[in-house]
Structures are given as structure tokens and as C-alpha cells.
Amino acid sequence: MQLDKGLFVAFEGPDACGKSTVSKLVYQKLINFFNNKDSVILTREPGGTEVGEKIREILVNYDIDPRTEALLFAASRTEHVWNVILKAKANKKIILCDRFIHSSLVYQGIVKNLGYKNVYKVNQFGISKIKPDIVFYFSANPKVLLERKTKDKDRDIFDRLDNQYAQEENLKKIIGGYSSILQFDNRNVIRLDALKPVEELANKICATILERVR
């Protein structure tokens, strides 16, 4: 089935909100719907390209200055946008991206006190005004997120960043940061209750995506 147009979708939220699990299920559901795995791309940030994955390894394995961290995230994102996302969208594909610029604005800009405007400027140099057509934000109570984090042993780069701020008050800072950033431009933001069943969330997201591409 040929799509009428491409669509760039980002999944955002604090660690343990369930967005990665849901995005993978959405990917499988869309592939089954179109009966064509080439119609949908599941990708992530940092990463998504060979260069991006190398940068991800650095971010995971080294403790670095927040400014360096912000620049590395921006570099990975620049490669990702120009070599994967825009090309896929031009070819009328659906791009499902686990995190995008919002994560940098929150984690480096607000949590690490670099200033979200400074982080935004760095990213704009690399990606211009490219932004997702839809941002699904997974909202959850800090206490619930902490409970999930203690149960899940499979940690990654943003999980490491979160672990530096694992106390409930600092999780509130992360969630508050998302609220501030998403208010900055909320025209394409859809808020989801992360406590809803995974299947229910995936079905809602798929329905929204299909409305946009047909």
C-alpha cells in the first residue's frame, strides 16, 4: 500500500514512561496494517545512523561535561535528520522516532541548567526548523516512574541521565521541564496517559497516524 504522504512522529517522555515499548508495538501494528515493512521506520535518538550510534556509545560509556553532551546529541540529531528522517519522509514513509529535540531541551537545557534556549540554538544550526509532524508525550506520576525504574534493569543513555536525578523531586523537575517545553509549541503535541494499557495506547497512536497519512 502506497502512502499519500510521509509522516514524522516522535515519542517523548521521562525514562520508564513506556514510550519505547509502545513505539515498538506501534511499529509492528503499522507494518501489519500496510503489509509492507518498508512503509515504516523505527528509529531512535541519539542514534539512527552509523555516526549517531557511535555518538550514543560515547554518551553511554563516558561521563562528560553537559555542554559537550548537548553538542554530541545535536551532532547525532543532525546526521539523523538529514540522512534518515527527511529522506524517508520524502519517500512517503512513516518515521517513528524514540525521542527528538524535546529530550535535549529538557535534559541538557533544564535539568543540566544549560538553558533550553541555548540548547535550542545549537540544534537549530544542525537541523534548521525541522520538527515532528506529531509528538506523542507520555505523562505519568513521578512515584509511578520511580517504581518502574527500580524494576527495570535494562538501562540506557537517558536512563543514565535520569539516574543522576532519580529522587522524586528531581523527576518532578524533568516532568516540569517537559511541560514547559511542550507549551513552547504544542500545536502538534498529543498527551497520553502512560498508565493506560500498552495495547490501548498503541491502538490510539496507530489510529491518529493513519488519519494523517490517508
Curated annotation (Swiss-Prot):
Its EC number is 2.7.4.9. InterPro entries: P-loop_NTPase, Thymidylate_kin-like_dom, Thymidylate_kin_CS, Thymidylate_kinase. One of its GO terms (cellular component) is cytosol. Gene3D superfamilies: P-loop containing nucleotide triphosphate hydrolases. ATP binds at residues 13-20. The keyword Transferase applies. It catalyses: dTMP + ATP = dTDP + ADP. Keywords: ATP-binding, Kinase, Nucleotide biosynthesis, Nucleotide-binding, Transferase. GO terms for molecular function: ATP binding; dTMP kinase activity. It comes from the Bacteria. One of its GO terms (biological process) is dTTP biosynthetic process. Pfam families: Thymidylate_kin (PF02223). Belongs to the thymidylate kinase family. Phosphorylation of dTMP to form dTDP in both de novo and salvage pathways of dTTP synthesis. This is Thymidylate kinase. The lineage of its organism: Bacteria, Bacillati, Mycoplasmatota, Mycoplasmoidales, Mycoplasmoidaceae.
